[in-house]
Amino acid sequence: MDDQPASSTPRAGGAAVLSRRGFLLGAGAASLVTGGVTFGLDRRSDAQSRDLEDSADPGGWSRGLGQHRVVWSVPTTLPVVALTFDDGPDPELTPRVLDALATSGARATFNMMGWNAARHPGLVRAVVDAGHELGNHTWTHLDLAGRSASQTRRQLDLGRRMIEAAGGVRPRWFRPPRGNLTGAAVCAAAELGHDVLLWSIARGPAGVGTPAAVANHLSRVVGPGDVIGLHDGIGRGTFDADGSLARHLRARRLVELAALPTALRRLQARGIRLVTASELVDALVPIRA
């Protein structure tokens, strides 16, 4: 994941879903080959906007397009939200995120870079042992926009294999770097057995921001069925880890981390249960043909 502005568009009366053609316009013709289920686009990041043709069906269920899913959020009125972290594992950030989650009792999905998982296998195992879920965030966080099918598949396959080797479990989810979901990525994800996980709410304030601003944003805009996209790493492997971009991203991550305990506490005070992506989707959105 790359930092993107979170949408604060009010929830529509029903959840928006993509028709076959609408998904093809947004993600490419690979969806016809691989199939997928898309749902929950009533609130979404600008980076993940797609051309919508259909409004939600009254029941708010997913639309069946095959055996694989593309998820932004889940249409529900139940106070359940998926918490996700990208770009790790990181020896400075990941343990502190795990501590905050343990204190709050929240569960999360960690979308890891294979490059980082191979270098910090103990952290991958710690995430699994703490009861959290693993996702595949590619091998080196390469932006997949404009990449060939073979380049794309290599990024997904190497990431998956390194994460599975370190954690001992196969990651269910694939989250594309920067939210750039291409036709080749949809194909590769389906071939590797992944569902695709995007996000509907990001950390909020532009720039580095402050812990108070991030916590205030999250506690204000998060609602039932959202997928929150945060970070426990900086995308290392794609740029100079000591360069200005890395320093800027680490400063942002430290602000997110400082905001996390307050944000979790406020969300739980609203009665919101924070769970993994699989817990959210499997409990609330059965596949419908």
Residue ranges of each PLM-predicted region?
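N-terminal pre-catalytic segment of deacetylase/amide-hydrolase enzymes
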Residues: 2-83, 89-103, 261-289
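Active-site beta->alpha N-cap acidic-glycine motif
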Residues: 53-136, 140-145, 151, 155-162
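Divalent metal-coordination and catalytic microenvironments
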Residues: 86, 101, 134, 174-177, ...
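Active-site beta-loop-alpha junctions enriched in small/polar residues
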Residues: 88, 113-115, 139, 177-179, ...
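Structural detector of well-ordered beta-strand residues that form the stable sheet scaffold
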Residues: 109-111, 135, 175, 197, ...
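His/Asp/Glu-enriched short active-site or ligand-binding loop at hydrolase and phosphoryl-transfer sites
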Residues: 180, 186-224, 272-283
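Histidine/acidic-residue-rich catalytic or RNA/ligand-binding cores of hydrolases
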Residues: 208-212, 238-246, 288
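Catalytic grooves of carbohydrate-active enzymes
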Residues: 223-278
